Amino acid sequence: MASSYSSDLKLELQATGENASTWGDKTNNNLNLLQQAIAGYQSIDVASADVTLAMTDASVSNARNMILKFTGTLAGNRQVLVPNSIEKFYIVQDATTHNSNTLTFKTVSGSGFTLDQGTISAAFSDGTNITAVNLNTLSGTIGTAQIDDNAITTAKILDNNVTTAKIPNDAITTAK
């Protein structure tokens, strides 16, 4: 039975007993591909044309990188297209100059989102669409900050660093 390839990262899945003298090389290649998926970075110029990322079996591919930085001055509306059926998490940086144009990060056949110039976004592909991970989509609460008794001393506050303009009325109380 011949090797097959994983659906998302295209890692080689060796059949039992296959590659008797080369399994180490193939395993090392898979580990390098995992490293690319977890920590890979690539800068991609998107100024003059749409870019379709590739994910090929058992070889370094730009769609496998965790972090993608988009650069260039957009000459028109641009799209960065992730292959369909890839399920993966991305961090994308829009380091382009838009000049009234847009930059969209999406799958080839599905939907995605428009990047804002100068921002870094987290996003995931579910194999059909790409969704931005925004702070307003996360849940949980942030507790109220408290300062312990005797935590602030004169030695810790430089002269003129605390002014009434920096402290709203009634912001400091003895109640905890």
Regions from the language model: what does each represent?
Residues 2-102, 148-153, 171:
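Exposed extracellular interaction/assembly regions and N-terminal maturation sites
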Residues 84-85, 117-121, 138:
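A short, sequence-level motif marking secondary-structure junctions
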